[in-house]
From Swiss-Prot:
Subcellular location(s) of the protein: Cytoplasm
Biological processes annotated in GO: cysteinyl-tRNA aminoacylation
Amino-acid positions noted as binding ATP in the UniProt annotation, renumbered to this chain: 270
Protein name (record): Cysteine--tRNA ligase
Name of the gene encoding the protein in the UniProt record: cysS
Required cofactor names: Zn(2+)
Top class in the EC scheme: ligase
A Pfam family annotated for this UniProt entry: CysS_C
Motif 'HIGH' region per record, residues: 32-42
EC number in record: 6.1.1.16
Taxonomic lineage of the native organism: Bacteria, Bacillati, Bacillota, Bacilli, Bacillales
Intervals of motif 'KMSKS' region: 267-271
PANTHER family reported in the protein's UniProt record: CYSTEINE--TRNA LIGASE, CYTOPLASMIC, CYSTEINYL-TRNA SYNTHETASE
MF term (GO), any: cysteine-tRNA ligase activity
Cysteines joined through disulfide linkages: none
Length: 466
């Protein structure tokens, strides 16, 4: 039995992780609707589930990771109309932008990134099968899911049909039998992108896309289905209803959801004007700092985005990079062996075990980062020894690299050119002149992390490589 325990939204408790097939994990993560650049809420989901994938691979699992693109949707059609472009052109542009953003954030590409428009036939077959089983019906070119027929509806979001009924309404123009029913196929309106189907020209509804693509690429039952907390209902609830009605099997064994992201203690929304796009923010800050920030809170908890917390994350990452850099620079001056090598190697092994213990407990990256800080503390203590050995230094470096890689963090730093150092010193001098001491300190810390030591003298600032 695996020592990993994860919180399952379906059961509302932590459970031992036992994939359907030993050592193999089938994982589906709901991807973006590509009508704009992704915002930092999307980035949190991308970073969180990339890290969970990395950790499962670190623990020896063979992970097949699928994350979709919704490349046809009401929002895309609206954007195309406003910009005077085609839906495929807009989708293609923002898919490319998505890959650029997540790569900057240290996220690996999924094994498969299916697009809705490349899977229309699969979706149509799925819908037809639901009609054949009595779970869906067609009205004037629209196809709806018969929600009440699926008796377990509400089991993921822990709501009863009666509770859901109270808030359900039929919109003007909808012809469904029941307010709880939802669209599987939408009849085309004039000028909209559409495909031929047994019910006339149209396009898929949102919920059916993920059910059809998850089944096509991962089978009837998958190990982990994941996404943002806001997708629990109705999206994931509807996916379960569709998939389990068709196959008669559980759709996913474990459901994982990351918590909300707030901006300065307010919900992020366009109406409040606090919408932060990854495309913009990574031009202002190191993307690794944003990733570190996202992982500094447990993935299920809400996280508050603010300048102060980003600055705290920057300092934390700098501490780790400085410890790693100091080890690298000490390597050349180290001997082959010292008397207490085994004691230090044992300490490092204990720290690795602590990291695994924390991450095994529902992927607790916040505590995992705390363990990395302990590794940095022990490394700094070791470097105070009169003599150091290559064996121990290598053990520290290897542990830093492996554990940081699980979190998608890179501690190695490219060496600065002399002119780059001089430019940063000039920028620091200007900041001090303008009494912007926070910026001056930040530049000094960044240089120190890259092993550049500054000395302020009456004649000006001198520097040397440590």
């Amino acid at each position: 039995m695996s020592s990993i325990r994860l919180y399952n939204t379906l059961t509302r408790k932590k459970e031992p992780f036992e994939p359907l097939e030993p050592n193999k994990v089938k994982m589906y993560v709901c991807g973006p609707t590509v009508y704009n650049y992704i915002h930092i809420g999307n980035a949190r989901a991308a970073i969180v589930f990339d890290t969970i994938r990395r950790y499962l691979e670190f623990r020896g699992y063979d992970v097949t990771y699928v994350s979709n693109f919704t490349d046809v949707d009401d929002k895309l059609i609206k954007a195309a109309r406003e910009l005077g472009e085609s839906v495929p052109a807009i989708a293609e542009r923002f898919i490319e932008a998505y890959f650029e953003d997540i790569q900057a954030l240290g996220c690996k590409k999924a094994d498969i990134h299916p697009r809705v428009t490349e899977n229309i036939d699969t979706i149509i077959e799925f819908i037809q099968a639901l009609i054949d089983k009595g779970y869906a019906y067609e009205v004037d070119g629209d196809v709806y899911y018969r929600t009440r027929k699926f008796r377990e509806y509400g089991k993921l979001s822990h709501q009863s049909i009666d509770e859901l009924q109270a808030g359900a309404r039929i919109e003007i123009g909808e012809k469904k039998d029941d307010p709880l029913d939802f669209a599987l196929w939408k009849a085309a309106k004039e000028g909209e992108i559409c495909w031929d189907s047994p019910w006339g020209k149209g396009r898929p509804g949102w919920h059916i896309e993920c059910s059809a693509m998850a089944r096509k690429y991962l089978g009837d039952t998958i190990d982990i289905h994941a996404g943002g907390q806001d997708l629990t209902f109705p999206h994931h609830e509807n996916e379960i209803a569709q998939s389990e009605a068709l196959t008669g099997k559980p759709f996913a064994k474990y459901w994982l959801h990351n918590g909300y992201l707030n901006i300065n203690n307010e919900k992020m929304s366009k109406s409040l004007g606090n919408f932060v796009l990854v495309h913009d923010i990574i031009r202002e800050i190191d993307p690794q700092v944003l990733r570190f920030f996202m992982l500094s809170v447990h993935y299920r908890h809400p996280i508050n985005y603010s300048e102060e917390l980003l600055e705290s994350a920057r300092r934390g990452l700098e501490r780790l990079k400085t410890a790693y850099s100091n080890l690298q620079h000490r390597l050349q001056a180290s001997t082959n062996l010292t008397d207490n090598d085994e004691e230090w190697v044992s300490r490092i092994a204990d720290i690795r075990a602590s990291f695994i213990r924390e991450m095994d407990d529902d992927f607790n990256t916040a505590n995992g980062i705390a363990v990395l800080f302990e590794l940095a503390k022990q490394a700094n203590l070791y470097l105070q020894e009169k003599t150091t050995s290559e064996k121990v230094i290598h053990a520290f470096l290897r542990e830093f690299e492996q554990l940081a890689d699980v979190l998608g963090l890179t501690l190695k730093q490219d060496e600065l050119l002399d002119e780059e150092i001089e430019a940063l010193i000039q920028k620091r001098n200007e900041a001090r002149k303008n009494r912007d001491f926070a910026l001056a300190d930040r530049i000094r810390d960044e240089l120190r992390a890259k092993n550049i030591i500054l000395e302020d003298t009456p004649q000006g600032t001198r520097w040397k490589r440590g």
